[in-house]
């Protein structure tokens, strides 16, 4: 998409009111049939869709243009009928030119798959329009791609099983149409943050769906639970991966948004989050030795609690190009955390802390931090995000992640932050005081911390350094070391992905 991505919502709303719709579409709105039918005038004009076979990593090298019924360009550019064939499909544009991400993706594919055919589907004339008109054109472009694939199938040794359609934003739904219209079944479709407006809640044949290819994997990076979402929120593939919950991406955060508003560059922040899906896919191509893993979970909140770090029964998978086919699943939601830039990989840890108290302190809201010490490196001080509340005399589960590979964990420092002068923390202190007026001294006891690595699936148990001292209070810390019987490997089936 172009730098004018936020105008998408404006143009869409204008279209709805202009068409006489009493209520503009919303995130859960149904799709009107008329918005997906090509206009009558479009049937009289030959669709402007070109297929550019890129034969070099150099973006200045034009390559060859393929057209149905003309075999000479296939020979001139040495089209390999037995190799993998990638079709890259861009999305809506307000600039009318290719974005930089496209050239990076072409280069990354050539680097990873040297013998592959990389075809850029150029539908800029049909995409460089009002968003609603571009949506109407997606079906036309999908038909054009299907015709190209049907023609290629007439050639010896060409197989649809080797075809991988990669669609960004609106291009993801174009890929879905192509997979639906082609004679046969495409091997794979990857949707990179498929567009949301006019597709959220749509019928299965009017958007990208698991039926469009043998394997459909989707990355969601710009979804929102409120208002209009640029990317689609609902799962639309066999596996749907939501990095960082699918909304606020590291490096494109609220502080950047506020700063961009001040300087009038809000579109860059929107573009950053929407386009992050592309860069995650490129990262999976060029940083093959640093794969990122996602974990199946019912929702983002459960993942934030650290509950969903299992690899049993296909519950984890690589993201991007390295994703393993899981044809038996549909609309499987998976989550992970990432860094702010390449390589995006982080290391996930589930921490189980049994908190008990000898005093009836009522409800408390402690602020905990941990520091992990390993054989390779030590982590920074990491916050323990409390999604709901701390349960006393119960086991509480947390998710922490590090940007470095710490190696084997050796010890853990747990810190209970003391009172600060922020209004929020003062309010927390006041509420805690009101909840337990007869027990002004706040103290919790923790004997052990159990840790599970998402990437290796290994488990460790850590005990307090001093068995006689298990108490922690605001402004204090506790140290934990690996218990004598602490190192154990979970006795379960092997992970379904090749873990490093």
Curated annotation (Swiss-Prot):
Highest taxon of the lineage: Eukaryota
One of the GO BP terms on file: positive regulation of high-density lipoprotein particle clearance
Tissue-level expression: High level of expression in the liver, placenta, lung, thyroid, kidney, testis and in the corpus luteum of the ovary. Expressed also in coronary artery endothelial cells, umbilical vein endothelial cells and in hepatocytes and osteosarcoma cell lines. Not detected in heart, brain and muscle.
Leader sequence residues: 1-20
Keyword Glycoprotein: yes
Annotated positions binding heparin: 325-337
Principal location: secreted
Entries under Pfam families matching the protein: Lipase, PLAT
Disulphide-bonded residues: 64-77, 252-272, 297-316, 308-311, 463-483
EC number in record: 3.1.1.3, 3.1.1.32
Catalyzed chemical reaction(s): a triacylglycerol + H2O = a diacylglycerol + a fatty acid + H(+); a 1,2-diacyl-sn-glycero-3-phosphocholine + H2O = a 2-acyl-sn-glycero-3-phosphocholine + a fatty acid + H(+); 1,2,3-tri-(9Z-octadecenoyl)-glycerol + H2O = di-(9Z)-octadecenoylglycerol + (9Z)-octadecenoate + H(+); 1,2,3-tributanoylglycerol + H2O = dibutanoylglycerol + butanoate + H(+)
Glycan-carrying positions: 80, 136, 393, 469, 491
SUPFAM superfamilies on file: alpha/beta-Hydrolases, Lipase/lipooxygenase domain (PLAT/LH2 domain)
Top EC category: hydrolase
Keyword Lipid metabolism: yes
Note: It is termed endothelial lipase due to the fact that it is synthesized in endothelial cells, a characteristic that distinguishes it from other members of the family. However, this protein is also expressed in other cell types.
Protein name, UniProt field: Endothelial lipase
Source organism (scientific name): Homo sapiens (Human)
Species lineage: Eukaryota, Metazoa, Chordata, Craniata, Vertebrata
């Amino acid at each position: 998409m172009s730098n004018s991505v936020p105008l998408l919502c404006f143009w869409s709303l204008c279209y709805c009111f202009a068409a006489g719709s009493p209520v503009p579409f919303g995130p859960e709105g149904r799709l009107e049939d008329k918005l997906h039918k090509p206009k009558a005038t479009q049937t009289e004009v030959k669709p402007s869709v070109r297929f550019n076979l890129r034969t070099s990593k150099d973006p200045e090298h034009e390559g060859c243009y393929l057209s149905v019924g003309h075999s000479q360009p296939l020979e001139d550019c040495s089209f390999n009928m037995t190799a993998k064939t990638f079709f890259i499909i861009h999305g809506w544009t307000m600039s009318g030119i290719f974005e930089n991400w496209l050239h990076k993706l072409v280069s990354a594919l050539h680097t990873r798959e040297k013998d592959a055919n990389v075809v850029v589907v150029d539908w800029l004339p049909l995409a460089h329009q009002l968003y609603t008109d571009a949506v109407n054109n997606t079906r036309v472009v999908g038909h054009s791609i299907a015709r190209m694939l049907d023609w290629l199938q007439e050639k010896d040794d060409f197989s649809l099983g080797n075809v991988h359609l990669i669609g960004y934003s609106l291009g993801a739904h174009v890929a879905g149409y192509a997979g639906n219209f082609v004679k046969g079944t495409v091997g794979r479709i990857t949707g990179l943050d498929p567009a949301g407006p006019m597709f959220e809640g749509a019928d299965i044949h009017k958007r990208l769906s698991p039926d469009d290819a043998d394997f459909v994997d989707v990355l969601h990076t710009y979804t929102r639970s409120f208002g209009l979402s640029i990317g689609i929120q609902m799962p639309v593939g066999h596996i749907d991966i939501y990095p960082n919950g699918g909304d606020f991406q590291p490096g494109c955060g609220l502080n950047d948004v506020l700063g961009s508003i001040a300087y009038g560059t809000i579109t860059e922040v929107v573009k950053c989050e929407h386009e992050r899906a592309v860069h995650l896919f490129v990262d999976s191509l060029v940083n093959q030795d640093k794969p990122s893993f996602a974990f199946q979970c019912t929702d983002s909140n459960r993942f934030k609690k650290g509950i969903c770090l299992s690899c049993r029964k296909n519950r984890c998978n690589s993201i991007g190009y390295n994703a393993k086919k899981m044809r038996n699943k549909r609309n499987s939601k998976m989550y992970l955390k990432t860094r702010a830039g390449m390589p995006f990989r982080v290391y996930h840890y589930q921490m189980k802390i049994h908190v008990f108290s000898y005093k009836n302190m009522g409800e408390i809201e402690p602020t905990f931090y941990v520091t992990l010490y390993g054989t390779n490196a030590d982590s920074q001080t990491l916050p323990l995000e409390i999604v709901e509340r701390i349960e006393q005399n119960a086991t509480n589960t947390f998710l922490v992640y590090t940007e470095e590979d710490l190696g084997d964990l050796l010890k853990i420092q747990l810190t209970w932050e003391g009172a600060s002068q922020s209004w929020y923390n003062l309010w927390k202190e006041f509420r805690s005081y009101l909840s337990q007026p007869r027990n002004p001294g706040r103290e919790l006891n923790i004997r052990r911390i159990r840790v599970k690595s998402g990437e290796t699936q290994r488990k460790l148990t850590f005990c307090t350094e001093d068995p006689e001292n298990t108490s922690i209070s605001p402004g204090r810390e506790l140290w934990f070391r690996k218990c004598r019987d602490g190192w154990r490997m979970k006795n379960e089936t092997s992970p379904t992905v090749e873990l490093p």
